[in-house]
């Protein structure tokens, strides 16, 4: 454990940020999983609706630095391609 006051404060702040980031990352993954579930079910309308809900969430997390912008773009591109493949 840290002995210096500023190091103790940083440890507390880091733990708080870690929990916040974990929560946001989990939320984002849940939205992505909803899109995959709709695709697996073969329901294009539900998949498109879930994608439209997921897209701003992923973009926001990329803008805030939680994930890299290229990872956000990759998620969106892959899901869009899979949705477009549905009949």
Curated annotation (Swiss-Prot):
Which Gene Ontology BP annotations are present? translation
Superkingdom of the source species? Bacteria
Which Gene Ontology CC terms are recorded?
Answer: cytosol; small ribosomal subunit
One of the Pfam families matching this protein, by short name: Ribosomal_S20p
UniProtKB keywords: Ribonucleoprotein, Ribosomal protein, RNA-binding, rRNA-binding
What ranges does the record give for the region Disordered, renumbered to this chain? 1-26
Q: What does the record give under GO molecular function? A: small ribosomal subunit rRNA binding; structural constituent of ribosome
- SUPFAM superfamilies from the UniProt entry: Ribosomal protein S20
Q: Which PANTHER family match?
A: 30S RIBOSOMAL PROTEIN S20 (PTHR33398), SMALL RIBOSOMAL SUBUNIT PROTEIN BS20C (PTHR33398:SF1)
> Per its database record, what is this protein's job?
Binds directly to 16S ribosomal RNA.
Q: Which family does it belong to?
A: Belongs to the bacterial ribosomal protein bS20 family.
> Under what name is this protein listed?
Small ribosomal subunit protein bS20
User: Whose protein is this, by species?
Assistant: Klebsiella pneumoniae (strain 342)
Its gene is rpsT
């Amino acid at each position: 454990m840290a002995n210096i006051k500023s190091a103790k404060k940083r440890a507390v702040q880091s733990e708080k940020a870690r929990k916040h980031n974990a929560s946001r990352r989990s939320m984002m993954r849940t939205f992505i999983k909803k899109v995959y579930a709709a695709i697996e079910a073969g329901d294009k309308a539900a998949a498109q609706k879930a994608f439209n809900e997921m897209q701003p969430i992923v973009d926001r997390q990329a803008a805030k630095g939680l994930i890299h912008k290229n990872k956000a773009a990759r998620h969106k591109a892959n899901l869009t391609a899979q949705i477009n493949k549905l009949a």
